[in-house]
Every structure is written in C-alpha cells, then in structure tokens.
Amino acid sequence: MEPQKIMPPSKPHPPVVGKVTHHSIELYWDLEKKAKRQGPQEQWFRFSIEEEDPKMHTYGIIYTGYATKHVVEGLEPRTLYRFRLKVTSPSGECEYSPLVSVSTTREPISSEHLHRAVSVNDEDLLVRILQGGRVKVDVPNKFGFTALMVAAQKGYTRLVKILVSNGTDVNLKNGSGKDSLMLACYAGHLDVVKYLRRHGASWQARDLGGCTALHWAADGGHCSVIEWMIKDGCEVDVVDTGSGWTPLMRVSAVSGNQRVASLLIDAGANVNVKDRNGKTPLMVAVLNNHEELVQLLLDKGADASVKNEFGKGVLEMARVFDRQSVVSLLEERKKKQRPKKSCVC
C-alpha cells in the first residue's frame, strides 16, 4: 500500500466574520478536508489567526491550533482590526489568506455612561442617555450612589433638575442611609437643597446612625444652608437615634464651629440638653478642647454645675483630660460667679 500523498497547501480564503460586538470579533474558516482530523495528529492541518499591527505593519499570532473558529476578545469599541489566516500543512509548508478587515461596534449605553456624565457635569450627554431609555435613572454606581446623589453632593444644580424631571426618586438612600438632601446639606449647596425640598425631600429622613439632614449640615458648617433650613421649618433640637445627640451636640463633638452653634442656639437649641450618657453640649465641648465654643456656650446660658451619669462636672472632666486652657477658663468664670463677701466694719 502506497503512503498517503500530502498535497501542498493552496492559498486559503480569508477568515469569515461572525458575531461582532463592541469588545469581540468571531472568526471562522471552513477548509473542507483540511479541517478534518483523520489519522495521527502529525497529519492534521494547523490553523493560525494573525492580527496586523497598523503602526508597525507586522503580524502577531493571536490563535494557533486545530479548531475552525476563534473569538478575539478584549478589543476597543468602534475600532478597525485586520486579520489573516495562516494554514500550515503536516509537512510544515504554510500559506496565508488575504486580509479581512472588520470594525467593532459602538459600546452600548450603560449605567457607567450615566454616572460618567454626571461625574464630569456633562448636561448634553446626560440628556442623550436618559432620552435613549436604556438606562434606569436611579441605578446606583459601585459605591451605592444614584446619579442624583452624586449631582447633589457636587452641587450640579442643572443636572439635579434634569434628573428630577426624568423621574429620579429624591428620597432614595445609599448604603449608609444618606439621601441626596443630606449630601447636599453637608456639602453646602443651598440651591440644590432648596430644589430638593420643593420636590419632596424630607427633613425627617434619617441615615443608619439616626442622623438627619440638619446633623449633617452642622457637620459641614455651612451657615447659609443651616439658616435656610431653620427658616424652612427644620427641627432644631432633633435627636439622633444612636447617641441621642442634637445638631448642637455634634458641633460640640466634631467641629467646634462657633457660628454654627450660635445659629442653632439663637433658633432655640437647648444648651443644656443631655445625651444618652448624661453629657451636655458643654461637657462634650470641654472633652474635645473646643475652648472658644466652651466660652460661647457659657455666654449662652450653659450650666457648668451639671453632673454627668458618674457625678462628674465639666471642671473635673477638664482636669482629668488635661484641658489646661479650658480649666483656666472655667476657673475664671467660677471666680466671677462667687458672691463678694460683705465688709464688716
């Protein structure tokens, strides 16, 4: 029996283009008998797909094997690619097909595009995405923020209006329970705060720590926002559900901002309110060494004689925590409050 005669390879046809997406291209080839795997592997034809480098005008192998289909992945959207097929015979001879050119498709609109448009304050792109109807307006980003939350936090008032007009829910919350109004109050964006209030945002909403928008506005320290919130009817002495702190208590604990504290007190905040542990704003200000705030609270009627749950007063606390400047202040105030002894002649 004569040995099988291997014919030299003829020039193959270019690979056929199958399914094309924004990041992949399917290529396949049908070479009749050459694709059949008969006999030992050394008698099979081997196929390679090569991709052209448009800058260097060279080719790189992206697939080699015995299959008749390959999906090229990890491609860029709307980009032209050129491929050729290399067929290698069992004897090692090879032939190349003509080139085939194919472009990937446009990347489909997704939630990432929505959040990207908001992040860079691109009004036109945001409108186009929303008008396309393929992306839900309230889909959160990877941090759990809706597009409205991001726009409110950044102070992009025009984007806020676009999102609200397209049906976004102004009362949605992120993973920590904060809504768009809280974020805008903390960041000090008064125009956004006013707009959200007109469209249903509530002062009563609470985050997971039980804090309201006024607690966050106090932390942010933006007096114009706080002043407007008070005029709009926001409760001044609202208590969080965690520590039992009012906004004034948070000022004493966090920033020590005298202007914010003064605004709250003038609007009716109780300077002698107690938290769950019996501490007053004055005690908390002393512990955090906010000397000027301590002075303000005393001037506004804070009672320095109040004791906490352990029977300790503010002067004892200041000494224990070595708040020397506060100790001096409290001692000076105490001296001034002592009644003068009458002179006996």
From Swiss-Prot:
<comment type="function">
    <text>Through the activation of JUN and AP-1-mediated transcription, may regulate apoptosis.</text>
</comment>
<feature type="repeat" description="ANK 6">
    <location>
        <begin position="277"/>
        <end position="306"/>
    </location>
</feature>
<keyword id="KW-0677">Repeat</keyword>
<feature type="domain" description="Fibronectin type-III">
    <location>
        <begin position="8"/>
        <end position="108"/>
    </location>
</feature>
<keyword id="KW-0963">Cytoplasm</keyword>
<dbReference type="InterPro" id="IPR036116">
    <property type="entry name" value="FN3_sf"/>
</dbReference>
<feature type="repeat" description="ANK 5">
    <location>
        <begin position="243"/>
        <end position="273"/>
    </location>
</feature>
<comment type="subunit">
    <text>Interacts with COPS5; regulates the phosphorylation of JUN and the transcriptional activity of AP-1. Interacts with RYBP; may prevent the ubiquitin-mediated proteasomal degradation of FANK1.</text>
</comment>
<dbReference type="GO" id="GO:0045893">
    <property type="term" value="P:positive regulation of DNA-templated transcription"/>
</dbReference>
<dbReference type="GO" id="GO:0005634">
    <property type="term" value="C:nucleus"/>
</dbReference>
<dbReference type="GO" id="GO:0036064">
    <property type="term" value="C:ciliary basal body"/>
</dbReference>
<dbReference type="InterPro" id="IPR002110">
    <property type="entry name" value="Ankyrin_rpt"/>
</dbReference>
<keyword id="KW-0539">Nucleus</keyword>
<dbReference type="GO" id="GO:0005737">
    <property type="term" value="C:cytoplasm"/>
</dbReference>
<dbReference type="GO" id="GO:0005929">
    <property type="term" value="C:cilium"/>
</dbReference>
<dbReference type="GO" id="GO:0097546">
    <property type="term" value="C:ciliary base"/>
</dbReference>
<dbReference type="GO" id="GO:0043066">
    <property type="term" value="P:negative regulation of apoptotic process"/>
</dbReference>
<dbReference type="GO" id="GO:0043065">
    <property type="term" value="P:positive regulation of apoptotic process"/>
</dbReference>
<protein>
    <recommendedName>
        <fullName>Fibronectin type 3 and ankyrin repeat domains protein 1</fullName>
    </recommendedName>
</protein>
<dbReference type="InterPro" id="IPR036770">
    <property type="entry name" value="Ankyrin_rpt-contain_sf"/>
</dbReference>
<keyword id="KW-0206">Cytoskeleton</keyword>
<dbReference type="InterPro" id="IPR013783">
    <property type="entry name" value="Ig-like_fold"/>
</dbReference>
<dbReference type="Pfam" id="PF12796">
    <property type="entry name" value="Ank_2"/>
</dbReference>
<dbReference type="GO" id="GO:0000785">
    <property type="term" value="C:chromatin"/>
</dbReference>
<dbReference type="GO" id="GO:0005654">
    <property type="term" value="C:nucleoplasm"/>
</dbReference>
<keyword id="KW-0966">Cell projection</keyword>
<dbReference type="InterPro" id="IPR003961">
    <property type="entry name" value="FN3_dom"/>
</dbReference>
<feature type="repeat" description="ANK 4">
    <location>
        <begin position="209"/>
        <end position="238"/>
    </location>
</feature>
<keyword id="KW-0832">Ubl conjugation</keyword>
<dbReference type="GO" id="GO:0051091">
    <property type="term" value="P:positive regulation of DNA-binding transcription factor activity"/>
</dbReference>
<keyword id="KW-0040">ANK repeat</keyword>
<feature type="repeat" description="ANK 1">
    <location>
        <begin position="109"/>
        <end position="139"/>
    </location>
</feature>
<feature type="repeat" description="ANK 2">
    <location>
        <begin position="143"/>
        <end position="172"/>
    </location>
</feature>
<feature type="repeat" description="ANK 3">
    <location>
        <begin position="176"/>
        <end position="205"/>
    </location>
</feature>
<dbReference type="GO" id="GO:0005829">
    <property type="term" value="C:cytosol"/>
</dbReference>
